[in-house]
């Protein structure tokens, strides 16, 4: 988080650039399946990212779309001057979530272990800054 210190008369005011984030925890999809989708939208504008995610048939794309929309909604709620055109996807992280382990009965009294994987998705969006040089 970046901050700037500004002096107003005798008072010192600290201006903080907010981080607009959203998290999805224990979402029912394997991180291995969601990471390639996350790589497609990282660094793109919000509108392009949503367009890409809507066009994908994957379950992970739908989960990622919800988290990205939530992060953008948080940004527009906390900063009333922001619009959808001014937002881009800054950080997307997909981590391992909780694993659900089950026993799967097999022939001749044996048993196999079935592991269902979940994932945590973290998305941070930021506003586009025009660089004038």
From Swiss-Prot:
Part of the 50S ribosomal subunit. Belongs to the universal ribosomal protein uL22 family. It comes from the Bacteria. This is Large ribosomal subunit protein uL22. The keyword RNA-binding applies. It comes from Borrelia garinii subsp. bavariensis (strain ATCC BAA-2496 / DSM 23469 / PBi) (Borreliella bavariensis). One of its GO terms (biological process) is translation. GO terms for cellular component: cytosolic large ribosomal subunit. PANTHER family: CHLOROPLAST 50S RIBOSOMAL PROTEIN L22-RELATED, LARGE RIBOSOMAL SUBUNIT PROTEIN UL22M. SUPFAM superfamilies: Ribosomal protein L22. The keyword rRNA-binding applies. InterPro entries: Ribosomal_uL22, Ribosomal_uL22_bac/chlpt-type, Ribosomal_uL22_bac/org-type, Ribosomal_uL22_CS, Ribosomal_uL22_sf. One of its GO terms (molecular function) is structural constituent of ribosome. This protein binds specifically to 23S rRNA; its binding is stimulated by other ribosomal proteins, e.g. L4, L17, and L20. It is important during the early stages of 50S assembly. It makes multiple contacts with different domains of the 23S rRNA in the assembled 50S subunit and ribosome. Keywords: Ribonucleoprotein, Ribosomal protein, RNA-binding, rRNA-binding.
